[in-house]
Design a protein with these regions (language model features):
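Rhodanese-like catalytic fold shared by cysteine-dependent sulfurtransferases
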Residues: 1-26, 33-65, 73-111
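Short, surface-exposed ligand- or partner-binding patches at beta-edge/loop junctions that are enriched
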Residues: 68
Length: 111
């Protein structure tokens, strides 16, 4: 991440898993509500990408946030928005829920 805070880190499964296990990052699932309810990374909160795009200042993110979607594309857009809003440590989960599921890692169901 640059000193000016104009970029985010794009990390894959093993690095993301370590960050989540460390407990210092907020995990934000930007998928649609029906996708989130069907299964999500334990502890992830759902903030749909369209909500972020419609009202960026209306959504609060922690200083250390991991964004996740199905494969890492929608979450990259959310990551760009978070950087623009001044979030200091932004991480995009490249591979997303698809990689998490395929690795057999636990998922929570419901909201």
């Amino acid at each position: 991440m640059s000193e000016t805070g104009t970029s985010f880190r794009d990390l894959k499964l093993n690095e993301i898993k370590a960050l989540i296990e460390g407990g210092e990052y907020d995990v934000v699932d930007v998928r649609e509500g029906w996708e989130h309810v069907g299964g999500h990374i334990p502890g992830a909160r759902n903030v749909v990408l369209s909500r972020i795009l419609a009202n960026p200042q209306g959504v609060q993110f922690n200083e250390r946030t991991i964004f996740v979607c199905e494969v890492g594309e929608r979450s990259a857009v959310a990551s760009e928005m978070a950087v623009a809003l001044g979030v200091k440590d932004v991480v995009n989960f490249r591979g997303g829920h698809k990689a998490w599921r395929e690795a057999g890692l636990p998922l929570e169901k419901g909201s």
